[in-house]
Every structure is written in C-alpha cells, then in structure tokens.
A protein has these predicted regions:
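FAD-dependent oxidoreductase catalytic-site/capping-region signature
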Residues: 64-68, 78-277, 285-295
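Glycine-rich loop(s) and the adjacent beta-strand/alpha-helix scaffold that form part
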Residues: 1-82
Length: 295
C-alpha cells in the first residue's frame, strides 16, 4: 500500500519520532545512516542531533498532620470510592492534573529571569510505575528550564517498529550540574519555610545527609527523570547553519514538498512547558502552507 501527496507532506511525529522517520527514509546524518545500512538519499547532519529536555529532580518530603494520596491509595475500598466519585460526579482525585501546584524560581541571583520550574504533588513514589509510598509525603519536582546539555536520537536499525536510540546526555555540562545542586538546596529551603512547619517535613529523597556539591550532583543523576519535553532534533536555522534541518518556513532544507511542524524544530528548548509552543508551531505551519499555496 502507498499514499502519494499532491502538494506537501508534513511530519508531526515529535522530537523522537520525526528524526527516526527521516533516517528510515534516508534523510539525515550520513554516518548515522551508514551505521544502520540505510542509503543516503539526502544528507542533513542535524537530523537527530541537538536533543534537549527538561530533567526533573524529584525531591520527596515526609509530612505529618495531613493526609496525602499515598494514604488513600493503600485502600482498595478508597480506590473504588475515588473511581465512583469520578464516574458519577466527575470530581475527586482522579480529576487532578499531574501536578497541583507550580512555580517559577531562580536557582541563584546570577540569573535575570527564572531558570527553574517546580511541580508539586500530594503523593510520592520511588520510581514511575511503582506503588505510592505507605507514608504521607509530598513531591517537590524541580527542573532546569534552560539546560546546556545536548543529546541525540537516531534509528537503531531499518526496522520501523524498533525503538530509536535516545541519548539525552543529562547533566553532561558543568552549568547543569551546578544548577541541579542549587535546585535541591532550594527545594529544601521551600520545605523548611515557616508556613510548612506545622506539617514537619522530613526529607526522604535525596536524603538530608547529602550536603556537598559532589553528593548533590550524584543524587540529581539518581533521582532525575524526564519531564517529557524532548525538543530540537530537527532544528530551524539559517542556510548558513550546517546543523539546521528546516528553514524559517519549516521546509526541510534541500528538499521540496516536505515540512516539519512539531517540537523538533525548536532551536532551543522553551523556558516552560512545551505543549503550547508546539501548538503555536502547528498553527504557524498551517498559515505558511496556505500562504505558499496561493503563490
């Protein structure tokens, strides 16, 4: 089965899927294509490079004098009640967003604008997919909004069903390691604020005994996870930039009839969540395509 486009094809597979599809089509970094035995149809060295993401550091604090979702989810009976509350009244914990509180902050006074984003949840767990803790706790997740580290994503082989190889290279730059350590210190400062004193926060992760810069950086690597904001693997740029994949009209450089309209075209990651900027990119792509079609 095949499908042909009369005018244009628009790739919107995201910062992971788009470079993967390009490489499977023979478009990309010659050495990456050679590694999987894919003939080079169009060389573009920037495909799959420049991967950026927001690494979240999940600090956890045990609390007292208040219930959290950790407690309620230990009971099958209460789980059933939460389900019924949602089904019949569309209310309760199952209506909650992934985070119930967010804030922007600076890791140090050296930054002119906020370089951190916090997400706070009334629950905790050791790792995603594992059960919630049996003790009451809150999670203060903090991410570096402007990481300096860069990674890459490339096809693992010619099989389109095989997952691509993703190397984010988190904390590979000294600046990111410094911000990570300062972020944990700031999370501790927030937990120690007078307003939270009645709840007696006690640090569970990464551990109050970790105080040196080296220990905090190591802990950041252990408690850090993606916040699911991958971008920039098919970045927009000028013709003078050899790593640019698309031009200012989102057209794949050197090809006709192919555009990209997703988070992969961002030259740099945004200082906040990536969903709304991606919607803007899609709307702009539609506007550009309509304008070009009228020429």
């Amino acid at each position: 089965m095949s499908a042909l486009a009369r005018r244009e094809i628009v790739l919107t597979a995201g910062a992971i899927g788009t470079p993967h599809l390009l490489e499977l089509s023979g478009i990309g970094r010659p050495e990456a294509l050679a590694r999987i035995g894919q003939p080079v149809l169009h060389a573009l060295p920037g495909v799959g490079e420049n991967l950026q993401d927001h690494l979240q550091l999940r600090t956890i604090f045990k609390i007292g004098g208040a219930r959290t979702l950790n407690h309620d989810f230990q009971s099958r009976y209460k789980q059933a009640l939460m389900g019924l509350d949602y089904i019949f009244k569309r209310r309760g914990p199952l209506t909650m967003a992934p985070s119930q509180l967010g804030l922007f902050a600076k890791s140090s006074a050296d930054y002119a604008t906020a370089n951190l984003e916090f997400h706070v949840q009334p629950l905790s767990l050791d790792r995603f997919g594992e059960p919630l803790h049996k003790f009451p706790a809150i999670t203060l997740s903090v991410c570096n909004l402007r990481p300096a580290s860069r990674g890459h994503v490339h096809a693992a082989g010619k099989d389109s069903n095989a997952a691509p190889l993703i190397q984010p290279n988190y904390l590979s730059e000294e600046e990111d390691r410094r911000v990570a350590a300062d972020s944990i210190r700031l999370a501790r400062k927030i937990a120690g604020a007078p307003a939270l004193a009645p709840f007696k926060p006690q640090e569970y992760l990464p551990g109050a005994g970790l105080t040196s810069e080296e220990d905090l950086v190591k802990a950041a690597g252990e408690i850090g996870t993606t916040i699911f904001h991958p971008v920039s693997t098919a970045k927009m740029g000028r013709d003078s930039d050899p790593m640019a994949v698309v031009d200012v009209r989102l057209r794949v450089r050197g090809l006709t009839g192919l555009r990209i309209a997703d988070a992969s075209v961002m030259p740099r990651i945004t200082s906040g969540n990536t969903n709304s900027p991606t919607l803007m990119i899609a709307e702009k792509a539609a506007e550009l395509m309509l304008a070009d079609a009228k020429r």
